[in-house]
Amino acid sequence: MFTVKYENNNAYITVPDGIDLPHTLDCGQAFRWEEKGNGVWHGVAYGKYLELCKEADGTLALFNTTEHDFESIWRKYFDLDRDYGAVNNKLSKNEILKNAAEYSFGIRILNQEPWETLCSFIISQNNNIKRIKGIISRLCDNFGEDKGGYHAFPTAERIAECTLEDLAVLRSGFRAKYILDAAQKISSGEIDLEKLKTVSTDAARDELMKIKGVGPKVADCALLFSLCHIDAFPKDVWIKRAMQVLFGGELPDEAKPYAGIAQQYIFFYARETKLSV
């Protein structure tokens, strides 16, 4: 269990099961975080700007953070109430997953705002990280609320008011029509993202795939990174190949309740060990 203390408008968190900032913030889960230098990261989530770092003793430092913001945003965002040690012990019943978990120590699932996450992964289709971040930056700068020095991610309602001509400024190509369709379905209530947290993973996936351009991979990213479905397992070509090499294509049974965490570990492990896929 983590502990937190507040001092000089900063929050200092001791996380017994660790947090690795580069491998959590810059691994393709979220796209609005950047390293400023000297291990300090900054970004925007839930309309709030945050700077943070991990200190020499492993303490996670959140700067200029109120107790209210920590309790209402960052505690859940960084998944601090989940016992990753216990999860890793269960995964470690499989020797390959044990190695992957050890390699990936400190990677955590980010619990993000659902609309932002869905929209971001629509943008991510057939795209690279640099370009994804560029499109999202233009989306926020042009349509997000000005918070004084930074912009919040625009609401689905704001985007639903736009035309495809309005969205041309994003330079997002074919993705613009998918962004607009998603915004319209969310803002109208046709798809209720909050409700999807309470239904089965399969049912939630089917609902998200009613949006134009949303296939299983984009849906599973939204489910895992924003809708509390820790058993969602996003699959792209690369992870499918890694799964085939490591497990013959089928995730071991002990991993299935935590498939999303296992997916992050497998991806990182395969990349870092230069697994031939």
PLM segments and residue spans:
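HhH-family (HhH-GPD) DNA N-glycosylase catalytic core used in base-excision repair
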Residues: M1-V277
